[in-house]
């Protein structure tokens, strides 16, 4: 039931899919997190190699394309502990999208 609800919600963003897959994936992950925040396990995840954000909800991982593999993802709140310089770069370039 939850998976159907999530996929139905994601489908509403079909026209913005390209944007959320190429540069704004953090913001779509936040949309999903806030929309499905009633689930305690709902959290933002990050793939260090692919530089991609997604949301873990009810044990499954989602981005704007639907359910995706969890391989290579780590909890976003753990990235700072993993590599503080990488964390700062991600915030600057991918979340805030600051000009250099």
Question: Where in the sequence are the language-model features?
Answer:
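A structural boundary/capping signal
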Residues: 1-100
